[in-house]
């Protein structure tokens, strides 16, 4: 069973955020693989109009090209936000952090399967820093 990091840490911790805010951000991150898939589909010029019509876009004009561009921008901004914040959290561990927060992976998995080059304490410090930075970026 995977280690589950507790969303509640001491309010004295430099990266403290509210428990419910942590859950909100965690679930925001877990949407990343879906965003990547949809972004790739909207980047493909051969995507049929039926794909565009499936996405709820009630406030977007009827022009399919405009819809495609707006949806690429929408998903692209979210993808870039997570990648930028992971890079800010740690220059060397950003790939591991991004993989962990977007796929729900534990430190144990990162260490045994992916060979993360740091200890548990350092990793979880950067993990908390990631969510703290993301919270600031999303405000």
List PLM regions with ranges.
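Short amphipathic alpha helix immediately N-terminal
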Residues: 88-105
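N-terminal interaction/assembly modules
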Residues: 1-88, 108
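Short acidic alpha-helix initiation/capping motifs at coil-to-helix transition points
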Residues: 73-76, 101-103, 123
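Short amphipathic alpha-helical surface patches that mediate protein-protein
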Residues: 98-102, 115, 128
């Amino acid at each position: 069973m995977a280690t589950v990091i507790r969303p509640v840490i001491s309010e004295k911790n430099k990266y403290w955020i509210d428990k419910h805010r942590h859950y909100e951000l965690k679930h925001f991150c877990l949407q990343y693989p879906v965003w990547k898939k949809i972004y790739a589909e909207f980047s493909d010029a051969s995507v049929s109009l039926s794909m565009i019509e499936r996405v709820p876009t009630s406030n977007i004009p009827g022009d399919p090209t405009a819809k495609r561009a707006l949806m690429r921008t929408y998903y692209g901004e979210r993808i870039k936000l997570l990648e930028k914040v992971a890079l800010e959290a740690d220059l060397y561990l950003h790939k591991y952090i991004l993989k962990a927060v977007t796929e729900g992976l534990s430190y144990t998995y990162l260490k045994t399967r992916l060979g993360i080059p740091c200890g548990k304490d350092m990793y979880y410090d950067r993990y908390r820093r990631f969510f703290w930075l993301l919270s600031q970026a999303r405000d």
